[in-house]
């Protein structure tokens, strides 16, 4: 896959360069981040997004805090508050804590986290490719831009295409931030995978016409029973796929599983500014003063899942047993 990575670290400059994903696909612009404060703001503003990529960025945010002489407790707090739903953020910061005050150790651990993301996603792509075929539908963005590695759901799709199993991809535009239209379409085009963009509301009609053979999505946080949070709109896709008898898969690294949660009821759902719904790139698309509601994620019950694609293989029901075993909790 012709990867465009969401970041790079210039150690000699003490700068973490982020590809500003808000400006894609029209422009590929990298912005410099020099402090943990700036990193937290960049994560909040979605300069960088996607659960694994946020985790890697937060880890390097703590490296920047050392380099900039910031208060480490405050830096950690700011980064944790930047996006509440993606559990990878918290896992990465937990791993960085033992290295507070140790710049060299912090840098080694941040690089280790990034390397593990790449290794994990290569495995997810291999396993996921074995269960996808024909025409596949996906939602939001789960490629290298969202992860810093090879991608989760999109990595599996690209590998399945390479193996001759998948022939075409339906890409939900993913309102209101248009991650599908702006980012997934961009990555699939670079990878040379045949794909077609659709509005979110078209998915059910395509399923009814027999034009979808499987659905695969990413995960921002999964509970131990398999309930999971992903970009808002995922729940509707799961219900539609179930109604039409279409396999529905979630692809994720096991680091996206929150072992503290027995079910999806405890997953915090980020609510973003209504302005992101009523306006796009500064252009208002709704009447002035008209209210909007903007939960960034929804929770899909595990009963709608056919399988969970992880770096250790594809898990099938009962998911609680499989996840506990994969996490080494039994």
Swiss-Prot record:
One Pfam entry name: IF-2B
GO MF, any single term: S-methyl-5-thioribose-1-phosphate isomerase activity
SUPFAM superfamilies in the record: NagB/RpiA/CoA transferase-like
Reaction(s) catalysed by this chain's protein: 5-(methylsulfanyl)-alpha-D-ribose 1-phosphate = 5-(methylsulfanyl)-D-ribulose 1-phosphate
Pathway(s): Amino-acid biosynthesis; L-methionine biosynthesis via salvage pathway; L-methionine from S-methyl-5-thio-alpha-D-ribose 1-phosphate: step 1/6
Enzyme class name: isomerase
EC number(s) per entry: 5.3.1.23
Gene3D superfamilies cross-referenced by the UniProt entry: translation initiation factor eif-2b, domain 1, Translation initiation factor eif-2b, domain 2
Xref: InterPro entries: IF-2B-related, IF-M1Pi, IF_2B-like_C, Initiation_fac_2B_a/b/d, M1Pi_N, NagB/RpiA_transferase-like
Site (Transition state stabilizer): 140
GO BP of this protein: L-methionine salvage from methylthioadenosine
Top-level division of the source organism's lineage: Bacteria
Family classification: Belongs to the eIF-2B alpha/beta/delta subunits family. MtnA subfamily.
Stated role: Catalyzes the interconversion of methylthioribose-1-phosphate (MTR-1-P) into methylthioribulose-1-phosphate (MTRu-1-P).
Protein name per UniProt: Methylthioribose-1-phosphate isomerase
Organism: Thermus thermophilus (strain ATCC 27634 / DSM 579 / HB8)
Gene for this chain: mtnA
